[in-house]
Amino acid sequence: MRRFIPIIGLMLAVPSGAQQHDPAMHQQHMAATNHSQNKASDGRQLVKFPEQMKEHTLANMRDHLLALQEIQMALANSDYDRAADVAEARLGMTALTAHGAHDSSKFMPKGMQDAGSAMHRGASRFATIAKDASVTGEIKPAVGALAEVMGACVSCHTGYRLQ
């Protein structure tokens, strides 16, 4: 047992790859992927937005990613009320008006609209469950609800792409 303690200490001291983010490596990977993958081979449905609406929608999606990161950080810090507040304000049903969802939904196919609605409803559901976790201390239901939110994101991004 004593032989394993230094090894465990070393493992904890070395940062894992999952915690590190190297933007240059990501850009290299994306460049290589773009060169080897023709857009014609992209099986996702192309959704055409007016340029200004496309930029607005992409900015909203980037904000969604940032909100998900903030939610995960709040969960890691056991700040379940903060996680709930971010989820509802930035991703939940409350966020629909702030993000101009009604305007952009006019350009979306029904499946894309459904995935977006599922994400927003799921985020509001997560917010309620996270608030419960702040009282009960039970985090598993909140983590499961957050996974459902991410599932809606994955579903949409797997099926659709903007032009």
Predicted segment positions?
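Generic leucine side-chain signal with a strong bias for well-ordered alpha-helical environments
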Residues: 10-12, 75
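Sequence context surrounding c-type heme c attachment/ligation sites in exported
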Residues: 20-77, 81-163
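Sec-dependent signal peptide recognition
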Residues: 2-9
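N-terminal signal peptide c-region/cleavage motif recognized by signal peptidases
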Residues: 13-17
